[in-house]
Structures are given as C-alpha cells and as structure tokens.
Amino acid sequence: MSYDTDLLAIENICSFSEKWYHFIKDKKDLKIELRTKSANIDKFLNLDVLDNFIIAFTLSPEDIALKNEKYTASFKNRVKAIKELQNKGWKVRICIDPLIYTDDFEKNYSEMIEYLFSEIDKNKVIDVSIGVFRTSKEYLKKMRNQNKKSEILYYP
C-alpha cells in the first residue's frame, strides 16, 4: 500500500490502514499487503479477518533493529503483535528484510528465527520472505549525504 511510509505506525493519526481495509473488504479479487515494523495493531484486533488483506511484519534481529531501525517497535513487540493477530484469526506474512551481514550473522538470524517460531503459530504464517537492502541509486545518494556513518548505506 505504501512504499515510503509505515502506515500502521501512524494509524492513530490518519487511519489510512483502516480505510484500505474497508476499501478492499468487498473486492475478493484484489489483495493488499500492509507491511510494517510497527506493533500498532489494536484496530485490527477488532476487525473481521480478511483473506485479501495481508498484514506483513518486517523483522530483524534485535541488535540490528536497535542500531538501524530507529523509532520502530522492538523485535519482541512485533512478535507479540503477530501472536495477538494470529489469536484473532489473522494469518500474517513474515519478511526478514533487509538481511544485513554482521560478524554474528548466522547466530543472530538463527536465534531470531528460533525465537519467532517458538512464540507464534507457524500454521498461521502465509509465507516467509527474505530480502536484501535495495533502493534506487538517486535515493541512495541522498541517504548517504544525510547518514555519513551508516554501515548499511556504505556496505559493498
């Protein structure tokens, strides 16, 4: 629904996610994905589950999230949100994105995945996607000018 903004994170301000929910409710041949790093799910706990409205959570290991995902919900809060939605009947998509190489890469991601699937219902996961950091060259230049010390933006 939005490439540049986490709509669920600002749902309490603008209600765009709920508006999309109601827009798609009777359009069974159309699917919408709401991708988020937020845990702001309260509104969806009181709405009927729609198979064509996909709530997708982007996850990173806690240490990577703390370092690189400022002002987002913690990894454990996102997992808690997933669990709450699943308990209400929602199926979710899991997005491990962006995959970031660190010294403890295998350990961090293994522990994250083990914890995640020890807490949530794997049968209520639509799928799991894995992605790398990607952006246009022009936007990357702008981000590098604004974030001179970012490891992610200067990674080969």
Locate predicted features.
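Sequence-level detector for tyrosine residue identity
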Residues: 3, 10, 21, 71, ...
